[in-house]
């Protein structure tokens, strides 16, 4: 399987036609802007999931909602981001990896990850880290196996940005290049020295 491809879109969250769209929810039930937009488009489905206790917003949690009316995506993946005050670089990377790992059989996923604000970080940083963490979640070391592991995660990832944003596009390109280098290094490190 080829490496995951990344691109940006400026479409509104509810209008992105994709297999899955990932939006963030903080631990206090606070919705990120795209989650609020999806909640409005679905007449309260996101808030209903929070009020019922199905989604707590606790760091590392996810909830997939399928076939929501008013949303172009086939499923909405709510991603628990934890406490806004404690949301760090590490928490951002964990959230991205959890999105990818929670998306088996999905060919394309969109994520509003630039909204998952880490203090002191901009959208270029978020885009770069998104690409690195997503590719890291998809990495498999099976060069020497006769039967390769099935990689059934997304092959395309769309990063939703609020407006045409050169920094986010540059960050995605940088992140993709860094992820390619990291994957090559891991593959070479996993090979025996006599190859």
Question: Which residues does each predicted region cover?
Answer:
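N-terminal hydrophobic/helix-forming segments and targeting peptides
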Residues: 1-195
């Amino acid at each position: 399987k080829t490496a995951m491809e990344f691109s940006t879109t400026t479409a509104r969250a509810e209008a992105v036609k994709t297999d899955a769209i990932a939006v963030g929810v903080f631990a206090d039930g606070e919705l990120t802007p795209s989650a609020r937009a999806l909640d409005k488009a679905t007449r309260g489905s996101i808030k209903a999931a929070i009020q019922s206790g199905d989604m707590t917003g606790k760091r590392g949690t996810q909830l997939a909602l399928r076939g929501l009316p008013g949303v172009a995506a086939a499923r909405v993946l709510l991603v628990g981001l934890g406490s806004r005050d404690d949301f760090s670089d590490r928490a951002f990377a964990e959230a991205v990896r959890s999105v990818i790992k929670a998306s088996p059989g999905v060919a394309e996923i969109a994520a509003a990850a630039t909204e998952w604000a880490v203090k002191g970080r901009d959208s270029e940083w978020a885009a770069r880290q998104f690409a690195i963490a997503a590719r890291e979640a998809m990495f498999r070391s099976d060069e020497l196996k006769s039967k390769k592991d099935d990689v059934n995660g997304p092959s395309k990832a769309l990063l939703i940005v609020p407006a045409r944003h050169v920094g986010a596009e540059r960050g995605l390109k940088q992140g993709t290049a860094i992820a390619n280098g990291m994957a090559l290094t891991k593959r070479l490190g996993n090979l025996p020295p006599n190859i």
